[in-house]
């Protein structure tokens, strides 16, 4: 019985000593993160889709913050994310990457053909934002409010029952295309 207490005390003291050493080392060798990169990372949609050319949102935020990467490469975030980053960095807004005009790209949404879905859950596993719901061997569906249109769920589907479709314009998603509105200047008569 006495040997058990000695072992318990010895292991407890070793745990306490190693915990103190790890605590000291974590403070001594801590790497400070750039607060601007943290703020940019919070703005990005965290879909980890890779459409920007980086493996995820954090590497893209680091590239913007420290390497001066363009702020207009996040397709799922679109114009709203680009404008927030431009405001944060105090730079001029840029057109969304791939667009030479100032028109925002059409938002895409994954749609599952539920008649052909076999319930394999491969699309659920591939979705970075958990926008697809369903169970094994049951049909799946996409929650349109959460889907970023990143296209990561399309390739894993063995029955090819997922496709991306443009989101229909609603009063919430519709925007004026000011470049297509014809403007005619009418001269004003000056009275003498």
From Swiss-Prot:
Record-annotated 4Fe-4S domain positions: 32-91
Cofactor: [4Fe-4S] cluster
Gene Ontology biological process: electron transport chain
Cofactor mode of binding and number, as noted: Binds 3 [4Fe-4S] clusters.
Keywords assigned by UniProt, alphabetized: 4Fe-4S, Cell inner membrane, Cell membrane, Electron transport, Iron, Iron-sulfur, Membrane, Metal-binding, Repeat, Translocase, Transport
GO molecular function terms listed in the Swiss-Prot or TrEMBL record: 4 iron, 4 sulfur cluster binding; electron transfer activity; metal ion binding
Binding site for [4Fe-4S] cluster 1: 49, 52, 57, 74
Chain positions covered by the region annotation Hydrophobic: 1-26
Gene3D superfamilies xref list: 3.30.70.20, Electron transport complex subunit B, putative Fe-S cluster (1.10.15.40)
Function recorded in the entry: Part of a membrane-bound complex that couples electron transfer with translocation of ions across the membrane.
Protein name (Swiss-Prot/TrEMBL): Ion-translocating oxidoreductase complex subunit B
Organism of origin: Citrobacter koseri (strain ATCC BAA-895 / CDC 4225-83 / SGSC4696)
């Amino acid at each position: 019985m006495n040997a058990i207490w000695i072992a318990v005390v010895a292991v407890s003291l070793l745990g306490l000593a190693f915990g103190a050493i790890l605590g000291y080392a974590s403070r001594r060798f801590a790497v400070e993160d750039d607060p601007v990169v943290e703020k940019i990372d919070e703005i990005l949609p965290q879909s980890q889709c890779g459409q920007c050319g980086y493996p995820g949102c954090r590497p893209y935020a680091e590239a913007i913050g420290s390497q001066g990467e363009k702020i207009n490469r996040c397709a799922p975030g679109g114009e709203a994310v680009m404008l927030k980053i431009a405001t944060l960095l105090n730079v001029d807004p840029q057109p969304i990457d791939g667009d030479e005009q100032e028109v925002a790209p059409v938002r895409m949404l994954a749609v599952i053909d539920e008649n052909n879905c076999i319930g394999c859950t491969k699309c659920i596993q591939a979705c970075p934002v958990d926008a697809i719901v369903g169970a094994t061997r049951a049909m799946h569906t996409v929650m349109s409010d959460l889907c970023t249109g990143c296209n990561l769920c399309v390739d894993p589907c063995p029955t090819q029952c997922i496709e991306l479709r443009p989101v229909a314009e609603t009063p919430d998603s519709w925007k004026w295309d000011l470049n297509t509105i014809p403007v005619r200047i009418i001269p004003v008569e000056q009275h003498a």
